[in-house]
Amino acid sequence: MESLAHLPGIFLPLAGCVLALSLTTIVYRTVTNPLSHIPGPQISKWSSLIEQYYWFAGTKVEYVDYLHRKYGPIVRVTPTEVDICDLPAVREIHRVRGGYLKSEWYKSLTPPGVTSLLTLIEPAQYSEWRRLLAGPLSDTSLGKVEPMVTNHVHATIDRIASDLQSQGVSDLYKWWTYMATDVVSELSFGEPIGLLARPKETAWVMDYLDKVGIMHAWRTTFPFVFVLGRFMPVHPFKHAIQAIGLLGKWARQSIQQYRQHIQEQPESPKPTLFTKLFKTGKFDDFQLTYLAGSYITAGSHTTAVTLLYLIYAICSDNEVRQKLLAEIRTLPENFRHDELRHLPYLNQVITETLRKYAVVSSALPRVVPAGGATLAGYYLPGGTTVSTQAYTLHRNEAIFPNPEKFDPSRWESPTQDMKDAYMPFGGASRMCIGNSLALMEIRLTTTLFLRRFPEVHMSRQNGMRDEDLAQEQYLIMAPRGQRLLVEA
């Protein structure tokens, strides 16, 4: 018992030694880390806290862009991640069969046991899924659904006109989101969710879409929040999680209805984005339900936000407006989408919108292949997470002079560097399969909307201001004010 009395006196020196040894180990590992020679702030060598702070604030892309302007084309963002905006290095990272696989970070975007095209890492599995999913979204296949898309566009513009007549203003963020959601849901299952026809009954969809960005931030950083949320009386995403449940219920019902439709018409079922998936028999209803949700997220929000910023840019520049209107007036009354594909200025306006207001402009993390690689003049060992972000690439002054100016004419004769740095739909090896659908919706909507409302302008009612259009950047970008009120 007497020996135990001496323990307090022994414990303090022992604890001090353990602490000193731990700190020494941390310092040694930090100093000898193979990324220690990469430029960047000192905090990036020790912790991810600063990066996580900006990620949750929706301003990480601006923080990383600031680091590039201060430190150069390659910067250390966290102890294990670097970001690169050097164009030759970006080409190498996103080269088809280049060996730079997606990082494990993507898997944190989905619940355990669930896979989507976005989160697939292995190239062979991704190629198999892409073959099944991309066919209905090709330019050729989309020609068959053009009448359906056009009908939704007309219905949306009628809703906007009704708002303008009764209230004097209309919120384009709301209506573009409703339209794009109905389009992608009908393409997925043959029937739309019904936001345009029943906006009050389906308002829960907006509860989900409005929170999807910050929910991704929480899921990728603190996934346990969603697990514990089921047992918490108060939860920051209560309404969004309820909306996810309603979305899942709608998707399951739609899947069952489509299965019955296939049984009734096995030789000629109504084609949808999921028709081939049904035929393979490899996807259960749980997986299909999640895919439906991911399609609606990716296919609605991105298109709606792009349209919102396109109209905002036109409202802000009368020269752009008049030049675009003059081109649109050359179209016949009953034009087709193919004719819009060949309108030079319309497509320059769209391309410039996607440059300055890219909806997916945050980091695209990849993993350096085994054996390491030299990128932007620095050696990176295999396994290093290396990211690129369109936000910085699209603002490279050497490639895009005066990058903050909305200038569609810069795309009259684009250089090869402009084409390579332009990444609104992701890198070449994993480019979004829905880009053709998005462009069809954007071309048709822009043209038909401006034909109906050539004098549209941003409203100043209800406190609407330019600051509402500040970009909030998570996995996908959205206007911080989540609205664009217009008058016409």
UniProtKB/Swiss-Prot annotation:
Which Gene3D superfamilies does the protein's record reference?
Cytochrome P450 (1.10.630.10)
Query: For this UniProt entry, what's an example GO CC term?
Result: membrane
Checking Pfam families in the record gives: p450 (PF00067)
The signal peptide here is: none
| Pathway of action | Secondary metabolite biosynthesis
Q: Which family, according to the similarity comment? A: Belongs to the cytochrome P450 family.
Protein name per the record: Cytochrome P450 monooxygenase orf2
